[in-house]
């Protein structure tokens, strides 16, 4: 019931209008890692503000960046991880695997043009591709950070989680209810089967118990 109410209420506000209030905090974060690259910031902001996005918009981007802060506090997250967060859903059409690959290629193109070293560009693209399955290898600390931050929404409070599910449903508004329900159930089961779901000790402390509660609740 709550999910349906959310779908029919504030989530129908156009994405660009919802995201206007996030421009300043996002720009401050961007300027901290890529000063002088305003054109690239505006390009990414436009992409994250596309009207077909509900969950995969600027709110999600800011949430991932804030989650990275939590995971690395008191240190700052590595710049490559932060840039990967900025690019990880820069291309979003709702096609799993293809979106991440196109986002990684976009990162390679834009960051190379911005003058970043080839090794840094390659690392950002590698991290973006990891978000297609959230399975970083053993010892991949930066990959673990990004994957955990991307999935941090799973460990939210029940009302926040309901808003997340409602927003995801709107991202797939072109799919019928039965097909979406089947696809979503498969995603939830996949997430529950991930061992570990979160890879960093800090993320496990912050979100694991709530994430399992929320995911299991979707299947009941």
Show which residues each predicted segment covers.
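An amphipathic alpha-helix signature
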Residues: 27, 31, 41-42, 65, ...
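His-Asp-centered metal-binding catalytic motifs of divalent-metal-dependent phosphohydrolases/nucleases
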Residues: 64, 79-94, 103, 125-132
């Amino acid at each position: 019931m709550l999910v349906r109410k959310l779908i029919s209420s504030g989530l129908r506000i156009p994405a660009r209008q919802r995201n206007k209030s996030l421009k300043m905090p996002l720009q401050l974060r961007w300027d901290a890692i890529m000063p002088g690259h305003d054109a690239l910031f505006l390009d990414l902001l436009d992409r994250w503000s596309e009207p077909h996005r509900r969950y995969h918009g600027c709110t999600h981007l800011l949430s991932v960046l804030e989650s990275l802060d939590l995971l690395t506090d008191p240190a700052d997250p590595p710049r490559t991880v932060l840039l990967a967060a900025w690019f990880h859903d820069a291309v979003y059409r709702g096609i799993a695997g293809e979106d991440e690959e196109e986002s990684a290629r976009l990162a390679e193109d834009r960051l190379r043009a911005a003058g970043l070293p080839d090794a840094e560009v390659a690392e950002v693209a590698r991290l973006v591709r990891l978000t297609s399955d959230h399975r970083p290898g053993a010892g991949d600390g930066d990959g673990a950070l990004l994957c955990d931050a991307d999935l941090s929404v799973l460990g939210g409070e029940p009302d926040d989680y309901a808003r997340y599910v409602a927003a995801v449903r709107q991202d797939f508004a072109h799919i019928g209810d039965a097909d979406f329900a089947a696809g979503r159930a498969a995603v939830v089961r996949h997430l529950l089967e991930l061992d570990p779901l979160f890879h960093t000790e800090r993320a496990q402390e912050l979100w694991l118990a709530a994430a399992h509660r929320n995911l299991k609740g979707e299947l009941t």
